[in-house]
Amino acid sequence: MSAAVQPLQIKILDPRLGTVWLLPTYATEASAGLDLRAALDAPMTLVPGDAELLSTGVAIHLVDPSLCAVVLPRSGLGHRHGIVLGNGTGLIDSDYQGPLLVSVWNRGREAFTIEPGDRIAQLVVLPIVRVVLQVVDTFVESGRGAGGFGHTGVR
């Protein structure tokens, strides 16, 4: 079974995308995220603790207000090299039309060099549900109740 496909408007801001480097693309048929590349002019070394804002060379417009996009880290970069997103997750609203920028942070112990065109993050498009707040005095009791962090244990 294949996933639903919808068009996504994209502006190419760096002419190397689609010529020297691939446009944002799904790595496999079942990938959830489009790989985003570092639109750098030269290699950039992140020493431990450094964070930089990198261009992906594209802008998107989701158009449909029932959609949003999230910029997520690439698992291998975080696990192997300590390179994660500086803001955890980037949320792209449907009405945003500016350049996609990625905050990369080296939380590792060694310097890491990002080369021009390297895949640095992934973009996942998600449906959203907008809510209307309903103020109440009490909640109908649930099985969990107000049990918070760690209340279910690890086993």
From Swiss-Prot:
Q: Report any Pfam family annotated for this entry.
A: dUTPase
Biological processes per GO annotation:
dUMP biosynthetic process; dUTP catabolic process
Whether Metal-binding counts among this entry's keywords is yes
Catalysed reaction per UniProt? dUTP + H2O = dUMP + diphosphate + H(+)
Q: Name one GO molecular function term.
A: dUTP diphosphatase activity
Give the matching Gene3D superfamilies. Answer: 2.70.40.10
Question: What pathway, per the record?
Answer: Pyrimidine metabolism; dUMP biosynthesis; dUMP from dCTP (dUTP route): step 2/2
Q: Does the keyword Magnesium apply?
A: yes
Per the record, the domain of life is Bacteria
Q: Where does substrate bind?
A: R74, S75, G76, N87, L91, I92, D93
**What keywords appear on the UniProt entry?**
Hydrolase, Magnesium, Metal-binding, Nucleotide metabolism
Q: Which family does it belong to?
A: Belongs to the dUTPase family.
Spell out the protein name for this chain: Deoxyuridine 5'-triphosphate nucleotidohydrolase
Q: What is the organism field in this record?
A: Xylella fastidiosa (strain 9a5c)
